[in-house]
Structure formats: structure tokens, C-alpha cells
Amino acid sequence: MNKPKTKTCLVILSILLMCSGQVLAQQQGREKYEFTRNLPVYADSLIADLTYPLAWGHSDIRDFDAWKRAAREKVFDCMFTPPPAPANGFEAKVLYEEQREGYKARKLEIRLSRYYTVPAYLLIPDGKGPFPAVNVLHDHGAHLFIGKEKVIRPLACEDSVVIKDAEAWVQNYEGQYFGDYLARNGFVVFSTDAPMWGERGQKEGPRRDRYDMIAGNMMMYGIDLSAYMTYDDIRATDYLASLPEVDSKRIGCTGWSMGAYRTWMLSALSDRIKAGAAVCWMVTTDEQLTLHYSRTENGGFANCLPGLRRWLDYPHIASIACPKPMLFINGSKDKLFPVAGEQNAFAIMHDVWESQGAGDNLETELWDMPHSCPLRAQERVLAFFQRFL
């Protein structure tokens, strides 16, 4: 038998079976159902039962510092067991270095856990430090092939496929690498791959449809993939603070989309962070998980911390960062986040900052833009950090 022809026939047969299965599934719809558009039909009843009893103003804790400790403890509790700390520190290795215009770029490998090492990019301005620093947190975008390379221009040591992919993705930032922009303006910049992105992805390739399956399997170990992302961001910031080129009292974080989610989570949970700027990720669960809108960002496993919603909503978690300076920019044309949810979240946070006499430290802005991180947003973030770091 001709083996190449046999292999081709098997591939064709597999495709036909897959397609027929999809068609059959579409034809097998039942008259009665309980789920639609990835949500239960009783979604609004679930939302009505959410009272967020640990939120500031809902909780019976009246001392703000005591509330922050209790709220932070609850978040960590819902994040499950953290990855075990490395036994011998970060064991950082410089894999490659190149000089850029006004700053050096390094590729590193650092140990964030006894389980694993993590690749990272580090940009250091020329001149005498120490400098203020920013942990730039990459986005999701349903694009897992690259991570840190979305926000820092890939070094020359990277494969040409990675470089080409990053050059295409940076158009979401209007062609400017966010991290390089900050480095040119005097900031040390650091960025790592989140779990499942870039060099922390799957051997079989960056298949988005496998993300949820892997996240579910992680839960079977009693751990949480989204939580690991946040735990890593906290430890990566600890590493950043340890560098001699960095002024450890002037560290901020920023990101777009999932990077924005990572930003306010990190700002809330790490005392290392002195200021945070989040672009296009803030909403309330009431508007995020309802069937009232044709399309919303349900989040999925990328921001799933089991049980936490029974205690705190997104803006309540972000408010643990109070009274730190925080900037939130959302888009009025962002199809992922309903405007009502953005505005309600902003109002909740303003109430918290105002209650602590720190109203001037919280800046929330709703721009006439879609889900994007344009040059003017990056300029706004730079001005914010120049003011507060």
C-alpha cells in the first residue's frame, strides 16, 4: 500500500468526521435548554444573589487598613495554593544583551518557583541609576504564541518567526512597543511571559481551544492558572525591586486588556507597586455576566478565581490598592465591556478613594475608542508615571 496516499486519506477522513460532527451537533438542538451564549439562562438570578459582603462599605470592618488586610487575605484564599518559592532565590541568568538607542535590552531567565523558570525582557536606560521602574504586563488577545514580545521589541536572538509575529501584533499598540517607549523616557522596564503565553506555552503549539482544558486540569491539582499568573507577577516585581539599577520605592505597573487586569490585581496585592495604570479592563460583574448585551468579555479562566465573586467584585478588589495613585482608561466603543459596567466600576472605586481622602490619586477616564492601546493612551500612561513615580 502507498503510505503517503494512506496518510492523506486518513487526514481527509478525520476532517470529514470533524465537520460532520459539528453539523450533527447543530442539528441536534433540543427544544428545552439551560445554557445559551456561554451563560446559564438564570444568569441574572445569580447576579441578583451577589451582595459582595466583604466590599468596603458593605463589610462591618470600619478601619480601612484592617479592611485591606481582610480583603487581600480573602483574595489570596480564593487564589488557592501559590507555586512553591524557589529554594535558592531567583537564580537570574542573562541570556542575551544588546544596545538600543538610549537603553540596553536583556533577555533573562529567572526562577519564580521551585517548579519552573520564566523568560523575561529587561530594558535599562543609559546613564546613572537607580531609575524608576515599570513592570509592563502583556495582553491576552486570544493570541498565545508571544507574550513579553507584545510589549517589548524582540531581541535579535529571537527566531525570525517570533520577530515577525511581534511586528504584526504591535499594531494593536499603533506600531509602538509600549515597554521600549517607557525605556526611552527613563524607566527600567520589565516583562515576563504569563503562563500559557510565549515560551511558557504548549509543546503542541499555541492552541487557544486548549487553554480552558489546561486551566480546568490545573484546578484538579488544587491550584488555579489565573492565580499562578498573578503570583508570578508579584514575584517578578520582587525580582525587579532587587535590581541595583532600580529605585525600589518607585515601581509601577501597566498593561492593556488582560495586562490591565493584571495591573490592578498586582497593584492591589503587592506593596512593591507604588502606582498602576490600566488600559481597557475594568467592569462590574452585573454587566459582564448578564445576557442583556449581545457581546461581553466573560473573562473565562484567564481571570477566574473560584468563589471570589461571593465576596468581592472587580472594582472592590482594585480598591485594595487605595490610596495608591491609579489610572484607569476604558473605551466607550469597547465591545468587550458595556459602558454601564465601566461607569459603575469607576463610581465604586471613586467612593473608596474619596472615603480615604485620596480622591486626587484615582483617575478614571472613558475615551471615545474601541478595545485598543493607541499612542495617546501610552502617552497618558507615561505622563501619569512621570508624575507619580
How would you name each of these model-derived features?
Residues 77-129, 133-135:
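N-terminal cap/lid segment of alpha/beta-hydrolase-fold proteins
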Residues 129, 136-231, 241-242, 287-290:
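Cap/lid segment of the alpha/beta-hydrolase catalytic domain
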Residues 245-257:
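Alpha/beta-hydrolase fold nucleophile elbow
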Residues 301, 347-389:
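C-terminal catalytic histidine-bearing segment of alpha/beta-hydrolase fold enzymes
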Residues 321, 328-330:
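Short beta-strand/loop motif that positions the catalytic acidic residue
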